[in-house]
């Protein structure tokens, strides 16, 4: 196991490992645990009662965090026609059609999210799937990044809409803000994420859905969270 420094060990002492914290308690505690010289991201990690080997039990969805994530999201929009002006007006950072596809294929990656209109998806899939797919950036209707409403997609991403999905071990990792956030805003974002997760529970998943949860900052120790029984089948 890797050895932690004195700073980290001192932070661990502030967390009661025999306690499960309420979200309000944890949101207040992260203020004490975030001691890095930058504004640390606050994340939550949920272990789900699913079998990730079964495709019908995988969890994926999006949620609009009421107080955003605290980070600036650079959005690229692949579209054409009148949607170009709509995307620019909505605040997209880079907009284009076939020429943008070629630019990305050539190595341009100065964006954090990509959205596309349906009329561009054939070209996107053909030329960018292998490049964007492994990075989690390939536009997909399930993640709210493919559709005719360019304005809504761009504004949603800019305002703090995030995508969540389980990893191969059945755990969902998601940001809910920054350590500088007011604790009440972190709590509200957490509540929105919990609701979205429970709504995304697969019908084939049995028993307790939300098995365990932890909150952590970028450089800090994890805080065990209480779950009121979890979502049952």
From Swiss-Prot:
Domain of life: Bacteria
PROSITE patterns reported in the protein's UniProt record: RIBOSOMAL_L1 (PS01199)
Keywords: Repressor, Ribonucleoprotein, Ribosomal protein, RNA-binding, rRNA-binding, Translation regulation, tRNA-binding
UniProt cross-references to Gene3D superfamilies, sorted A to Z: 3.30.190.20, 3.40.50.790
Gene Ontology MF: a single term: structural constituent of ribosome
Gene Ontology BP annotations: regulation of translation; translation
Residue stretches in coiled coil: none
CC annotations in GO: large ribosomal subunit
One Pfam family per UniProt: Ribosomal_L1
Keyword Cytoplasm applies: no
InterPro entries referenced in this protein's UniProt entry, alphabetically: Ribosom_uL1_bac-type, Ribosomal_uL1, Ribosomal_uL1-like, Ribosomal_uL1/biogenesis, Ribosomal_uL1_3-a/b-sand, Ribosomal_uL1_CS
Subunit structure: Part of the 50S ribosomal subunit.
HAMAP family: Ribosomal_uL1_B (MF_01318_B)
Homology family: Belongs to the universal ribosomal protein uL1 family.
Function: Binds directly to 23S rRNA. The L1 stalk is quite mobile in the ribosome, and is involved in E site tRNA release. Protein L1 is also a translational repressor protein, it controls the translation of the L11 operon by binding to its mRNA.
Protein name, UniProt field: Large ribosomal subunit protein uL1
Organism: Deinococcus deserti (strain DSM 17065 / CIP 109153 / LMG 22923 / VCD115)
Gene: rplA
